[in-house]
Amino acid sequence: MKKIVFLMLALSGFAFAAEGSMNQWLASFSILAAGLGLGVAALGGAIGMGNTAAATIAGTARNPGLGGKLMTTMFIALAMIEAQVIYALVIALIALYANPFQALVAA
């Protein structure tokens, strides 16, 4: 509780600072959100890819005759998983360089 109160008191100086500081806050939170969002997306993608590969290896071990079909399906699934991470990267780049919230701060 003491840490939260100290943090709020420490940040209150920034809240009453000059008008131009809002752009700095927006930039810093955009960088934080982009990094955090991309990190979570990459973590989820890595877990999904690991589960996909494990399931494909287990399926091939059970029935070696289906190995080719399982590999094809696995590559399609991996491409779909990786596409989600690339979408997160695009959103992070938009938040960093073409920030749509810039107009709200200027108003």
From Swiss-Prot:
SUPFAM superfamilies: F1F0 ATP synthase subunit C. Coiled coil: none annotated. GO terms for cellular component: plasma membrane; proton-transporting ATP synthase complex; proton-transporting two-sector ATPase complex, proton-transporting domain. F(1)F(0) ATP synthase produces ATP from ADP in the presence of a proton or sodium gradient. F-type ATPases consist of two structural domains, F(1) containing the extramembraneous catalytic core and F(0) containing the membrane proton channel, linked together by a central stalk and a peripheral stalk. During catalysis, ATP synthesis in the catalytic domain of F(1) is coupled via a rotary mechanism of the central stalk subunits to proton translocation. Key component of the F(0) channel; it plays a direct role in translocation across the membrane. A homomeric c-ring of between 10-14 subunits forms the central stalk rotor element with the F(1) delta and epsilon subunits. This is ATP synthase subunit c. The record marks 82 as: Reversibly protonated during proton transport. Belongs to the ATPase C chain family. It is a multi-pass membrane protein. Keywords: ATP synthesis, Cell inner membrane, Cell membrane, CF(0), Hydrogen ion transport, Ion transport, Lipid-binding, Membrane, Transmembrane, Transmembrane helix, Transport. GO terms for molecular function: lipid binding; proton-transporting ATP synthase activity, rotational mechanism. F-type ATPases have 2 components, F(1) - the catalytic core - and F(0) - the membrane proton channel. F(1) has five subunits: alpha(3), beta(3), gamma(1), delta(1), epsilon(1). F(0) has three main subunits: a(1), b(2) and c(10-14). The alpha and beta chains form an alternating ring which encloses part of the gamma chain. F(1) is attached to F(0) by a central stalk formed by the gamma and epsilon chains, while a peripheral stalk is formed by the delta and b chains. Pfam families: ATP-synt_C (PF00137). The chain crosses the membrane at residues 4-24, 29-49, 74-94. HAMAP family: ATP_synth_c_bact. It is found in: Cell inner membrane. It comes from the Bacteria. Its main location: membrane. CDD domains: ATP-synt_Fo_c.
